[in-house]
Regions:
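Conserved class I S-adenosyl-L-methionine
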Residues: 88-96
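Class I S-adenosyl-L-methionine
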Residues: 1-18, 25, 157, 162-242
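Conserved SAM-binding loop of SAM-dependent methyltransferases across substrates and taxa
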Residues: 97-109
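Conserved acidic residues
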Residues: 88, 109, 154, 192
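S-adenosyl-L-methionine
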Residues: 1-88, 116-155
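Conserved SAM-binding motif I beta-strand of class I
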Residues: 110-115
């Protein structure tokens, strides 16, 4: 990501509550400002005020394009996930914007963020130090490729992409990327504890058949709306799942 100029940063700070559509129409008035970059950051701050309130006052946070941010976790759900995992080392194999990783990492001595999109990696590499999370290393790599080569860690987190080739929401693990059902054995050879975040639209009974080492199921609701389904896998396959 290209560094933000002082002029653009000042523009962002002065217009962070303004309508971004109106700002886009006024681009000619600000020849020294990178308007597309400014609009991305202003829109990001406005969404963060609702989704990630603890980041709102940190001026040095960079935000990704709108679609990526809409798909990311909220602070409420990220903090809940962080309450479930602690240890020495963590690997987040589907890093994205890095919200989940940033909160999960607070419970670990070291963490690795893995993401195949170069722009998101650049944003994460900038944001983690701004959040005083200097113990997170950033890897621009495919999550499965990294998994195959990585050394064992205490915990692994995955948030498989839940959209099919037509952009619609999916309800089967086999429609997600990566297909965690096919990776269960490899995942458990690399970590004692695996957390998988899935769509609440998932066919849960089928998912439990495909992931027999699931030890816990957590359904996260915010304001009476089901937001996420979490599966926690361990080394032993339980007889019953709490």
């Amino acid at each position: 990501m290209t560094p933000i100029s002082p002029e653009t940063r000042q523009f962002i700070n002065e217009h962070q509550s303004d309508d971004v559509r109106n700002l886009a129409l006024q681009a000619r008035k600000y020849p020294d400002v990178d308007i597309p970059a400014a609009i991305t950051q202003i829109a990001g701050r406005q969404i963060a005020a609702e989704k990630i309130p603890s980041w709102k006052e940190i001026d040095d946070i960079w935000y990704p394009k709108h679609l990526s941010l809409e798909q990311c976790s909220s602070e409420i759900t990220a903090r809940y996930k962080a309450s479930l995992l602690q240890g020495e080392s963590l690997a987040d194999l589907t890093g994205g914007f890095g919200i989940d990783c940033s909160f999960l990492a607070t419970g670990f001595r070291s963490a690795t963020y893995v993401e195949r999109q170069t722009e998101l990696c650049a944003i994460a590499a900038h944001n983690f130090p701004a959040l005083d999370l200097n113990h997170i290393s950033v890897r621009n790599d495919d999550g499965v490729a990294y998994l195959e080569a990585m050394s064992p860690v205490d915990c692994i987190f995955l948030d498989p992409a839940r959209r099919n080739e037509h952009g619609g929401k999916t309800v089967a693990i086999s429609d997600c990327e990566p297909n965690v059902a096919k990776l269960e054995g490899l995942l458990l050879s690399k970590a004692n504890r695996i957390m998988i975040k899935l769509s609440p639209m998932l066919d849960l009974s089928q998912a439990l058949k495909e992931l027999p080492h699931t030890q816990e199921v957590h359904i996260i609701s915010v304001n009476n709306e089901c937001k996420e389904l979490l599966l926690l896998l361990g080394q032993t396959a339980p007889e019953e799942i709490p």
